[in-house]
Amino acid sequence: MDRLGGPAGAGVAFALTAGLAADAGGYNALSYDRALLVVAGIALAGVLVAGGERPGLFAATLLGALALLTAWTAASWLWSESPPRALVEAPRVALYAVVAGVVVLAGRRVSPAWIAGGVVGGATLVAAWNLVVLVQHHGRAQASGVLADPFGYANGLALLCALGIVLLLRLPRPALVAAPVLAADLALQESTGALAALAAAFLAYGLLTRPRLRRVLAAVALAGVVAAPFAFAGHLRGRYWRAALHESAAHPVGGSGAGTFANWWLRERQVPFSTREAHSVYLETLAELGPLGLALLLAALAVPLAAAVRAREPALAAALVGYDVGAAVDFHWELPGVTVPMLFVAAAACVRASPPQAPARRTVMVPAFAVVTACALLAYAGAARLAGAEDALRVGDQARAAADARAALRVAPFSADAWGVIGDAEGSATAYRRAIALDRNDWSLWLRLANVSKGEPRRLALREAARLNPLASGP
């Protein structure tokens, strides 16, 4: 079993990296709920068959931070501006915690080289896939909307390529055959943030491996930090970040609730651009989950970096630095297709930094993963039914849309989106009111209610929609 640990670990890392990246980066709830169900099932089966290793100090801290961040994300339902979104966002963080848990349980049976190899393999496959798509759509990739296929977001695909390039430093020389594919795709995505992340990663690698150059490299790093604000001067991201800071100031304790930045942006924006994300994991977490949420996030990111340095794994440390820099200027935390590979690396570094541990107790691990698997099954069932309802609505099958939405409500009674689909399918003001009762700050629900109302109810609904989204063009 121990001999199979390395290849099995690499296979899981490869499959999740490639699978999530190919599924539009894992951005949608259906994608990450499905991944959570699969990974939790793998963890449960692994514990039952082969047991696992207890986490050392670094690994326990990482897992604790991710578990608490998951709980805090879900708990923000209690005070959120849009409570249903907290329960939609929480499974994504749970996926991150379970992925890290799988690597930690595998312990020293899976070396960092196997993990790095799996991530690089998955990244290379997706990069090659994208290059084929770009060749097929030569000269019209951007116009046809396939520039970042299958990942779906150019900056996310570019960061995945950058992480793959950095992790090649941990692999034997023959693995460098992947470098041209990764580098070419990184260049074609034209992502300034990913290039900055790659530069930061190489600087970190140099600082850890070239003692004589540390002063020079430190000076270069400092110059980059000083220049960063000027690089983003006048950029739309600056507006997102200011909105996030204003959101944080308005909710200084617990934040406004997971997934609510989109509401805040629509109310505050001065330009007719829409976004669901603040394009900075640190500012968005502070705005939505408050100082405690940010502290848990920073712990989850900083502890593995410290572990990689302690374990003398410069390539792993460099990859983690690259992700941390990239996530500062984009919404990569919401993209499991790039965050899950990072967490494979993070957990491997934590395992490497501690001495071998005693076997984990099955009496603790089996019930824990059984509960997570059951919760994942419920989340996936609700997301799948809702996705089916939305698909049916798009093709004009109102009866099936309403039926699937009601089925979604049986496992996710908190879903305002499901009631919204019922309202769309049946033209039902009652359904829209049920949705609004669950999420009063979704401007689109008020607008849709106005479209099926008359007289004073219509006027009041339009007024509320305009308050929540002043720059909307109207019904």
State each model region's role.
Residues 153, 239-278, 282-296:
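TM-adjacent membrane-interface loops and short helices in multi-pass inner/ER membrane proteins
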Residues 1-12, 58-61:
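N-terminal membrane topogenic signal
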Residues 21-33, 49-56, 82:
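Short, hydrophobic transmembrane alpha-helix segments
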Residues 228-239, 361-400:
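Hydrophobic alpha-helical transmembrane segments in integral membrane proteins
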Residues 7-24, 36-47, 66, 70-77, ...:
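Alpha-helical transmembrane segments of multi-pass inner-membrane proteins
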Residues 387, 391-475:
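C-terminal luminal/periplasmic domains and tails of membrane-associated envelope-modifying transferases
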Residues 2-3, 311, 345-381:
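A juxtamembrane structural motif centered on a specific transmembrane helix
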